[in-house]
């Protein structure tokens, strides 16, 4: 007979179940019918162009853009909130106290999803698909940064940046690649391993994943007015990545 789980064990079990649900849903690759219908209209060079745009945007943000992103939230306050939540969880030892970390992260995530939706639809209305990419990544990384701070983690080192990039790639993966990437991330967290891949190479892989996944939606977003539909994809994919994070 199993003994009664303590609050930490119960919360961990809930986290594991949420991860398993995500993996089950994301494992099979799905292609919408409308994507197949517009395939012949999508320029052959668009995926290469998207990859280059994502790659340059990641480089720019990691090298010079993080301080700009941090101006949109109070890092010190979030770090202080984590310390308060950690102390409360240690003293009270209840699931409600433990869930304070998730509530803090969830509030930031929901706000960023709303910003992403407005930004994506607005750019789509004017048919601006490619110029939307730095904004899309900026909001996405802001959301991940805030989640990290809510749980007491940082994002300043290249190793942490590689982790974030790998997380984004994994959230967009399917099948064996999803399982492999997820295992690598879990090992990194549990055993404090280091990644053998360079940051530039991981940027390339993550840019490949984003370009492949968003190819059709960015094509649609590049069409005036109709692009509003493609613009909604910014929020959809940010939610998918945030859910995995």
What are these regions (language model features)?
Residues 132-137, 229:
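Hydrophobic alpha-helical membrane segments of integral membrane proteins
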Residues 1-118, 145-245:
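Terminal, membrane-proximal amphipathic helices
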Residues 139-143:
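Structural signature of FAD isoalloxazine-binding scaffolds in flavoprotein oxidoreductases
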Residues 119-131, 225:
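Transmembrane alpha-helix interface/packing and boundary motifs in multi-pass membrane proteins
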């Amino acid at each position: 007979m199993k003994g009664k789980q303590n609050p930490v064990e119960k919360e961990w079990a809930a986290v594991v179940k949420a991860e398993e649900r995500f993996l089950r849903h994301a494992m099979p690759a799905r292609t919408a019918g409308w994507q197949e219908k517009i395939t012949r209209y999508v320029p052959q060079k668009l995926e290469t162009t998207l990859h280059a745009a994502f790659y340059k945007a990641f480089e720019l943000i990691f090298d010079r853009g993080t301080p700009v992103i941090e101006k949109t939230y109070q890092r010190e306050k979030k770090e202080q909130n984590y310390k308060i939540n950690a102390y409360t969880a240690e003293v009270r030892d209840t699931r409600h106290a433990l869930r304070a970390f998730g509530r803090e992260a969830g509030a930031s995530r929901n706000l960023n999803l709303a910003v992403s939706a407005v930004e994506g639809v607005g750019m789509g209305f004017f048919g601006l698909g490619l110029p939307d990419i730095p904004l899309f990544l900026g909001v996405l990384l802001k959301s991940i940064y805030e989640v990290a701070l809510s749980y007491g983690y940082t994002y300043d080192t290249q190793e942490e940046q590689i982790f974030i990039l790998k997380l984004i790639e994994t959230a967009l993966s399917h099948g064996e690649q999803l399982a492999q990437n997820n295992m690598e991330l879990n090992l990194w967290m549990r055993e404090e391993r280091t990644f053998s891949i360079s940051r530039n190479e991981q940027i390339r892989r993550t840019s490949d994943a984003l370009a492949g996944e968003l190819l059709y939606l960015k094509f649609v977003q590049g069409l005036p007015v109709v692009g509003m539909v493609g613009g909604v994809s910014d929020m959809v994919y940010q939610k998918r990545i945030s859910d995995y994070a």
